[in-house]
Amino acid sequence: WMSLLPDGRYLSELNIPGTHDSATANVEGSWNASYNKVACQKYFIEQQLYAGVRALDLRTRWHGDDMVMVHGDFICHTPDHNNRSKNKTFRSVLDTVIEYLDKHPSEAVIVTLKIDSGDEDKGRLALVNILNEYTANYPNRFYCWTETAFPNTLVAAQNRMTSPTLGQARGKIVLMTRVDMSGAGESSLYSYTGPDLTKWDDSYKDRNHYAQRIESESKVAVYIQDDYSSPDGNKKKQVFNTVYQLNGTYTLPGALKIEKKDFVFNYTSKTGSDHYGSTPLGAAKYMNDLIYNDDLFTPGSKTAKENPRLGIVVMDFVNKQLCRRIVFRQNTPLDDLIHRRGGQA
């Protein structure tokens, strides 16, 4: 769907469907998602990409001799079931995204990366090695946040970063990391790891009902609304107010003005619902219904026209219909593209 959008628009300006805990479609103990507290997705990552998802939330940890995908302490598995499934590795996810971009170079995929559990020192070292390997082997598949990739300290790289246009990001993984990599000394890898999001967890408790900027040295601002323990009505207010903040529609006391070059992650996900039970699936039933039915997310509605920007809408249990609600809010004739691809975005 990005193929119909102009190169000159900032990637941060687009309305982008994203997934929370993207690798959890087959996770330890997820045989019944209704009762499971760690499964957050039905679609595997390749299916998400073909449904229109363009932002992935990847959680990983050191396990054995590799970095595996996890939700907390629970390991994610490959699509195979019964005794044939294997641990899902970070490398395999990168391979999946790169293969997708090889086939669809008009698209860009934002990836946020976090070590969710385990030995952080070993995990950090392993991630540095993996990312050095992949950015060296696939330099055209990773967005370089600085003008050129050369050895920098983390702070120096942060001060040289610029927000990408869609044209600059096409065909690339646009990486942002919640991992503290400052101990790597001078490294060209800092040109690829994006704005420093290590203070994410200092900002997620959005009790003021709007998105908050993550403190960092980066010249590219990143805002998040990610209160995952909020009651249903409060979470709805947080999601909606973040959209109003993005568009300057209402004056929200204390809320910072968001520029078009700024990235905004607006999480609809949470741990449970007052109405549908204390699981991510229960929360998704409540929040996803809002996206399906509310005028704010309805293409062409008066409210949508007054609030054209949604940011990166990060969801649990995403599907094609949810993605279309976000994608069609670009004020661009995307219907024809969807129909030509047989329903794939």
Tell where the protein language model's regions lie, with residue ranges.
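A residue-level signal for conserved active-site and pocket-lining positions in enzyme catalytic cores
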Residues: 111, 175, 313
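Active-site groove signature of glycoside hydrolases
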Residues: 105-119
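Short, aromatic/basic amphipathic alpha-helical patches
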Residues: 125-134, 186-196, 324-332
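Surface-exposed substrate-engagement region within the catalytic domains
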Residues: 143-303
